[in-house]
């Protein structure tokens, strides 16, 4: 198979693979893809290894900067968000009696900001990372007109720990920065499902959870009345992580769904390697990294506990941002690093922690999408586009058509707009039944 190959001018600055066996995970012999860059740029962030913690860490959206230490300390009490005050979100005691994707309750809400659309919110049954039943939420926007229509599940980037920051709120209170993109989808006549993919504890960083919630949200929307059309997936950055995991999980977790394509951009595909790249020194977005550590602790409290590893400043910060949204999180720890908040030596992480890291990183998660994939990244993205290219190469080797594009000169924030235009056109072609392009 032909390889997805970087342009000649980009090869010299490719960061070397992290040498830590645990972080790297399994090695895949993958082809290198023939990228479709519209020009050459260089990515020059070199891996820092001198400050490798005894921990797994994650950087997420809008440049990413997670640097924190998970150690072998005894499990303590994770700090969870204040409960959602709206009783509509509450899981019924019998949630385990429902099947994944079953609608528990529904309601209409005003579709302010989405002209001509109607909006429904669906509480449905899903499963957390341990497989336990949970209640999750998706908001479904339906454009005017009748008949069968495609459904796009759009996963927003949500860099938050508070339940009030979830898409089901941000869609209508101005907090969701991707509302304009949703109107572009509605203008095409497509229904749009927007899941609260961080789950009922706002477990920021738990990407596999986001994939499950996304798929069960699609099931819920179809069982609610949108079962006649094809399905597409889309998302960027943290939303791209949930999108990528939904595509990779679907063949086993939800094989019955008629998903015809997935489009994802700016995706952090290996949370450990990204941490080694950006976590060893002060970073303006370090707060997002700290928040992701808190989110992983919420989803895996017995293994990813932060108790005993934080100094008093870390304990205070964890409590202060427990209900915060993106801007507050960024401001709370701007230009800090893990040494400001954590204590401990340079020991290796445990096998259980490595397992959790791998199951939340697309590079090391073995599942492969069975539908065509469009993937894009900015040429100057701090979220290393080379790792995403490697994942695309593995998908190519497994027979999945992948179109991988580099947006020349774009950093993480700038790549979303042009890539989304291409992504929506790509999904439109999949809905029309056209052959999927591929630069495998």
Role assignments for model-derived ranges:
Residues 76-147:
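Catalytic-loop region of hydrolases
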Residues 82, 86, 268-365:
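Accessory cap/linker subdomain of secreted extracellular hydrolases
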Residues 128-137, 141-184, 196:
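Short, surface-exposed "cap/lid" segments of acyl-processing enzymes
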Residues 204-225:
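Alpha/beta-hydrolase active-site loop
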Residues 219-286:
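Primarily recognizes the serine-hydrolase "nucleophile elbow" in alpha/beta-hydrolase
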Residues 374-378:
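Short beta-strand/loop motif that positions the catalytic acidic residue
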Residues 381, 403-415:
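Histidine-bearing beta->alpha loop at or near hydrolase active sites
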Residues 382-388:
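Conserved alpha/beta-hydrolase "acid-adjacent" motif
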């Amino acid at each position: 198979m032909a390889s997805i190959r970087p342009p000649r001018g980009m090869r010299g600055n490719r960061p070397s693979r992290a040498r830590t066996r645990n972080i790297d995970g399994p090695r895949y012999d993958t082809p290198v893809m023939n990228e479709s860059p519209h020009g050459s740029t260089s990515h020059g962030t070199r891996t820092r290894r001198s400050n490798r913690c005894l921990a797994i860490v994650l950087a997420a959206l809008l440049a990413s900067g997670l640097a924190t230490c998970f150690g072998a300390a005894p499990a303590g009490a994770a700090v969870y968000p204040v409960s959602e005050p709206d009783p509509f979100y509450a899981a019924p005691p019998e949630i385990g009696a429902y099947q994944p994707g079953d609608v528990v309750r529904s309601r209409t809400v005003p579709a302010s900001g989405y002209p001509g659309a109607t909006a429904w919110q669906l509480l449905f049954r899903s499963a957390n990372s341990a497989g336990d039943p949970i209640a999750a939420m998706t908001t479904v926007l339906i454009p005017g007109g009748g008949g069968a229509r495609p459904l796009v599940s759009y996963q927003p980037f949500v860099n938050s720990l508070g339940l009030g920051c979830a898409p089901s709120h941000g869609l209508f209170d101005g907090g969701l920065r991707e509302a304009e993109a949703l109107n572009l989808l509605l203008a095409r006549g497509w229904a749009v499902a927007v899941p609260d993919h961080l789950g009922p504890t706002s477990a920021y960083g738990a990407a596999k959870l986001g994939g499950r919630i996304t798929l069960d949200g699609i099931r819920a929307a179809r069982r609610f009345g949108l079962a006649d059309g094809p399905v597409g997936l889309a998302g960027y950055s943290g939303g791209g992580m949930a999108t990528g995991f939904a595509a990779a999980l679907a063949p086993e977790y939800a094989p019955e769904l008629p998903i015809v394509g997935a489009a994802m951009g700016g995706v952090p595909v290996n949370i450990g390697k990204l941490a080694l790249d950006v976590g060893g020194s002060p970073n303006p977005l370090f707060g997002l990294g700290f928040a992701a550590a808190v989110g992983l602790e919420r989803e895996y409290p017995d293994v990813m506990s932060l108790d005993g590893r934080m100094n008093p400043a870390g304990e205070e910060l964890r409590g202060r941002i427990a209900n915060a949204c993106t801007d507050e999180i960024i401001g709370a720890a701007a230009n800090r690093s893990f040494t400001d908040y954590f204590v401990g030596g340079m020991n290796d992480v445990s096998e259980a922690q490595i397992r959790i890291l791998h199951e939340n990183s697309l590079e090391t998660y073995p599942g492969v999408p069975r539908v065509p994939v469009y993937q894009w990244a900015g040429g100057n993205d701090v979220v290393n586009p080379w790792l995403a290219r490697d994942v695309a190469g593995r998908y190519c080797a497994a027979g999945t058509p992948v179109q991988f594009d580099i947006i020349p000169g774009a950093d993480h924030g700038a790549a979303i707009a042009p890539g989304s235009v291409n992504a929506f056109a790509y999904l439109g072609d999949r809905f029309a039944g056209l052959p999927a392009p591929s630069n495998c």
